[in-house]
Design a protein with these regions (language model features):
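Active-site glycine/GP-rich loop and adjacent strand/helix microenvironment
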Residues: 1-17, 23, 137-351
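Nucleotide 5′-phosphate-binding alpha/beta core
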Residues: 1-75, 80-98, 102-106, 110-112, ...
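Proline- and acidic/polar-enriched loop/turn elements at helix boundaries
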Residues: 30, 41, 89, 116, ...
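Acidic/glycine-enriched edge-of-secondary-structure segments
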Residues: 81-95, 131-141, 158-165
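Short glycine-enriched loops at secondary-structure junctions
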Residues: 93, 120-122, 169-170
């Protein structure tokens, strides 16, 4: 999906902002002799950025606004190096809440729902993202945070939670505990918004069946606001993403060239109106594809397919590139295999 004229102008404005701010990113653009973009060709010639680049800006080098305009920071986990610190202005926080509100609305969630939020809070974007969007929607939020399953189930029963926001692994744990404790008839859940982890069809069906709820995939990453930049609809045929806030292109992860709509590749995201820390052509390493055509739900927003894995998940087996998602596609054909499995690669005689 080629960048349109409006998006191109927005990217150009983001570039001007970064250069003027003389931030880490602005200096990088100057080093490449970039002063702006006015065509698709200009845009596709822009350099990519990656998490390893952003770590070089630690702690606040990505900040593209005066400090008095920054109201919050979030960060990546930093498990493989320095964390990436992302500053937010008040407008960024509000824009994120607006996008998340759209996610809830796309999932058929209303201000009459009671939304139980189980992902973590703090520097991580997940918990507060789910909460801000629910408050923008006008729904009741039950801000549980992670763990403490006994308390989670008590609040779920006593407060009559109707929406569960969770990772796939924790929602499965809750489903198992609800069954084990005989609480199924006391639970009022009707929908689940699931993110942060890739999950297969078998796991999805198991959670849906055991909890008796509709499930929706939500997409996002800390560097680009957080969760809430896209979500699946009731037709479950991809995730609608908000192309008035972000531009998504799919590239060949080896050549870096854009691929046609419908072809699998790496997701690359550019922010269109972010203030605190704009990002241009950010390589996510997530694998997906743009789904061509309109969705049955009638939404005007384009769609990404479910995340199929990551470029850094790839294994090379006897010279063949293999992704865990490809193995999962084969395993799901066997009904006797559960949603949980382990991949072990044996090396015999050095092969």
């Amino acid at each position: 999906m080629k960048i349109n004229a409006t998006q191109l102008e927005q990217v150009n404005n983001q570039i001007q902002k970064l250069i003027k701010a003389d931030s880490f990113y602005g200096k990088r653009l100057k080093e490449h002799g970039i002063t702006g973009v006015s065509s698709v060709e200009d845009f596709e010639a822009l350099p990519f950025s990656e998490k390893k680049d952003l770590r070089g800006a630690y702690p606040l080098g990505l900040m593209a606004e005066p400090e008095e305009n920054i109201v919050r920071i979030h960060s990546s986990s930093g498990t493989t190096g320095l964390p990436v610190i992302i500053p937010y202005t008040a407008k960024d926080v509000d824009d994120w809440a607006i996008m998340f509100k759209r996610c809830y609305e796309t999932a058929g969630i209303t201000n009459l729902d009671r939304i139980q939020v189980t992902p973590g809070y703090g520097l991580w974007t997940a918990g507060i993202g789910f909460q801000n969007g629910a408050e923008k929607l006008g729904a009741m939020v039950i801000p549980m945070g992670p763990g403490n399953t006994d308390k989670q189930l008590q609040m779920m029963v006593d407060l009559g939670s109707t929406v569960l926001c969770s990772t796939s692994s924790y929602s499965l744990l809750l489903a198992e505990e609800i069954e084990a404790r005989g609480l199924r008839d006391k639970i009022k859940l009707r929908k689940g918004v699931i993110g942060s982890e890739r999950w297969g069809e078998k796991m999805r069906k198991r959670i849906s069946d055991e909890l008796g709820i509709e499930l929706y995939d939500i997409y996002g990453l800390t560097e680009i606001y957080g969760p809430g930049i896209g979500i699946s609809c009731k037709y479950d045929c991809g995730m609608h993403y908000w192309d008035d806030y972000i531009y998504i292109e799919i590239i060949d992860p080896v050549s870096g060239r854009p691929v046609p709509d419908g072809e699998m590749g790496e997701i690359v995201i550019s922010t269109l109106c972010k203030e605190g820390a704009p990002l241009i052509r950010y390589r996510t390493h997530d694998l997906s594809r743009i789904i061509p055509g309109e969705c049955e739900c009638g939404s005007r927003f384009p769609r990404l397919d479910a995340i199929m894995g990551r470029t850094d998940d790839m294994m090379k087996i006897k010279g063949v590139n293999v992704f865990p998602s490809q193995i999962e596609e084969v395993l799901k054909l066997s009904p006797e295999i559960s949603s949980e499995y382990q991949i072990r690669i044996s090396h015999l005689d050095g092969r």
